[in-house]
């Protein structure tokens, strides 16, 4: 990770959103805050850098949205996940608890908000597996499967993001290159936008 490097060859253009899972912290209420503090200022995450951590309570931003992260396992490949996409770590434990489900729901919302903000469609929503050359499913014997808890139902997760994106577009369907089939008024509640309220 090198600070202040801009996405997409220095243009800062966001070309997608990559979804990850990281483990829930035991006996911690706001995991996203703790992961952020482990990154800044404690430097306990080594070179790993993601744009957002999201839990069942809120989201914390770790990098500017035009900045290159270090999360996709594909190095400095010009067309890869590190160099072109925003990253979201959804904090879960795979238990199916109400906290787990809420964290995933918040991840759906954040992904949709970011896709909308940057004029992207659900076709630009990726798994970590995608950038490592794996299918969007659990791969036996793989070095890593990520997002571990979402991969088994990735298609449904993606459908939820698509539905939320359509809702944010006022009922319009976002297509390639950020175009909409029918223009509608974008709406987001105060509760939805509150996910962005806490950042480093």
Q: What are these model-derived regions, one by one?
A:
Residues 28, 45, 142, 147-150, ...:
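Short linear sequence motifs
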């Amino acid at each position: 990770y090198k600070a202040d490097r801009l996405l997409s060859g220095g243009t800062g253009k966001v070309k997608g959103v990559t979804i990850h899972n990281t483990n829930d912290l035991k006996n911690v209420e706001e995991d996203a805050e703790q992961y952020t503090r482990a990154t800044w200022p404690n430097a306990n995450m080594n070179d790993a850098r993601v744009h957002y951590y999201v839990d069942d309570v809120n989201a914390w931003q770790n990098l500017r949205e035009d900045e290159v992260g270090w999360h996709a396992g594909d190095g400095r490949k010009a067309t890869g996940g590190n160099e072109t996409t925003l990253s979201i770590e959804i904090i879960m434990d795979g238990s199916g608890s109400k906290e787990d489900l809420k964290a995933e729901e918040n991840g759906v919302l954040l992904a949709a908000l970011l896709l909308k903000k940057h004029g992207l469609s659900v076709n630009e929503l990726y798994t970590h597996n995608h950038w490592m050359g794996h299918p969007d499913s659990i791969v036996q014997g793989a070095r890593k499967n990520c997002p571990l808890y979402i991969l088994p139902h990735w298609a449904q997760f993606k459908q939820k993001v698509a539905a939320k994106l359509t809702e944010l577009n006022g009922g319009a369907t976002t297509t390639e290159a950020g175009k909409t089939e029918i223009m509608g008024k974008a709406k987001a509640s105060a509760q939805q936008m509150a996910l962005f309220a806490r950042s480093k």
